[in-house]
């Protein structure tokens, strides 16, 4: 609202009239789909309203009111800014200033979000010459009313003095690249900006601005006539532009304000407004997002073609063909792979995949030319069943997979151009498919390519420092391309409504058969697809200190090659889900499982007694290096059971022994903290007389101080002391764990000395993603195979205070926690607790405990 006096009754009446007319247009839009009609109608309604205000202010006919930006195009979204220019003659009466200010104020009073400027023609030209943003805004100037002669004079001078087509092209392309960089150069954002993201409306507007500035036309039809795009491409551009405009308009209507970001909260409503309905396999929002990603992908592809074509017109090449790459098929032209003529793919369908093999293997080629991209785009009918079954194409595809470098770039380009989905039809089904599982932050196709990229990085010397152990393993792994095939198929069956691992096996088996992959390699690929989740589930959800767990896992993998392949795929898979999911702790769990299993496969028996003896001997050797007296450990070790020594490695046993050997019968809590040996975490040791609420009390402290528990290993000594170890991370900010270790020791020891009752759990706020896509909380309590403990499995949306809420319920029922494995997967948790409690065999107590836990973890 403007800063002038309160609106008059007449202004309020006019505002109500305008609001009612706009509401009528929006209501009609809700039941129709023609967004262009809506945008034009909103522009006309705004024109009429502004004219009435202009007349009321008595502004002279020597001025002109000009619409600029989107309003200038006549494309006003429901809650867009209304950008106007009051154009003044060079010589004007300064007394007009007050009336112009009144006009702008009254326009605000209508309820319009006005963006205004007041300039002479000379000022417009001067500012446009210096600022490409002003230049762009004025490019689409449209006279609403006022002096026609003044507006025409402005238009002529603007095009003659302010607009340089080449400079404008360079500036807008740079601006587009910078904008894309803000969105990580991908249209596949979880919450895309329909206007600004790569493949969004701004890309389409940028192309039309560049074309208009160059005099090539201001519509897709005109660009088609000019020969810059084909009729088919123009049709595709109009279709996708219409969808994006409609989506943006519906977001505005649903939100009741300007809303260009397709946030989680609005995705379901937006989907339903387009008529999408949930199915058994897909949410309505997932269907809408897939449609959006396909549109953004097509816009990105066509924009690349158009920009290269316009650039070729504005900057004629000074040099032509650099070299011939494939006789009568491809040449290199200015670093781009170009077909020799537009009929290459029609004459030689096998050249389609050859293009990507050449891109992958030819040094100096940095991409595909506009001519090649266009030919690919228009070759969809060629990429049919006959093309997919062609022996040469299958051979070329395997060559692309088996090159020593360039594989990731080649497959990304194949996906961007839709060739990958045309060759592997089941891959096409998952392109743009969102996964609202609170775990993956990429669409299925992008996740698959990310996993492929991660495996490739293991094999590239320049990246060996990132994951040295993985790089070492893949360096000795024969035919690593089998891992790339497994990566392509491990999630290819997502969204089909069944077990994607089982369905993916059939796809992988068929691929191997059709591409001549031998028996052993084919068997490994199919097995990897079937078991790609197995290793992470064992490492993160089972007690790997239990020899039986290791024995069962070793039986599944069978040999070292299978174990190594599964380990490499698992690390790449977890790292390819979300930047938040992977951490060094999970890395250690997987590496430990790999090494233990490898020893078993090599003939070592998973024998608890021999493992216990080995770890104790190693720990004693470390203690001697620390100058701990020879028999000093006995007082503590005599109180510890076998489980303690199997759950901790030798270095950890030595550290805990060194801390506690003088305090075996301590009267007060002993708390020690140190940076975790695996990094990126804090290890906290607690030694104190045991009590039922101890675990919950420790969790309450961590919760209140922003520390997130990754792992808990709980032991009880023979003389009634708790010896608990926690791995925690700081949840809110980057922190040096060495700096906070002393503070944690002091605060937690003080907290444990208090006798106050457990505080009420604080139900921390869920993330927007979790609020929009809540998962059904699950609690499962059952006896373990030996009947010694009970296993509690909890699955829920992650939130601050969740672990403490669980621990408090257990404490209230005097149920002891023997061990806890905290598994955070993005926005959800899947926690496993090993419980001991005398009353847990009572079915009524089990039901009561499960009921209270469900209530505690509910959203």
Curated annotation (Swiss-Prot):
It catalyses: [protein-PII]-L-tyrosine + UTP = [protein-PII]-uridylyl-L-tyrosine + diphosphate; [protein-PII]-uridylyl-L-tyrosine + H2O = [protein-PII]-L-tyrosine + UMP + H(+). Its cofactor is Mg(2+). GO terms for molecular function: [protein-PII] uridylyltransferase activity; phosphoric diester hydrolase activity. Has four distinct domains: an N-terminal nucleotidyltransferase (NT) domain responsible for UTase activity, a central HD domain that encodes UR activity, and two C-terminal ACT domains that seem to have a role in glutamine sensing. Modifies, by uridylylation and deuridylylation, the PII regulatory proteins (GlnB and homologs), in response to the nitrogen status of the cell that GlnD senses through the glutamine level. Under low glutamine levels, catalyzes the conversion of the PII proteins and UTP to PII-UMP and PPi, while under higher glutamine levels, GlnD hydrolyzes PII-UMP to PII and UMP (deuridylylation). Thus, controls uridylylation state and activity of the PII proteins, and plays an important role in the regulation of nitrogen fixation and metabolism. Belongs to the GlnD family. This is Bifunctional uridylyltransferase/uridylyl-removing enzyme.
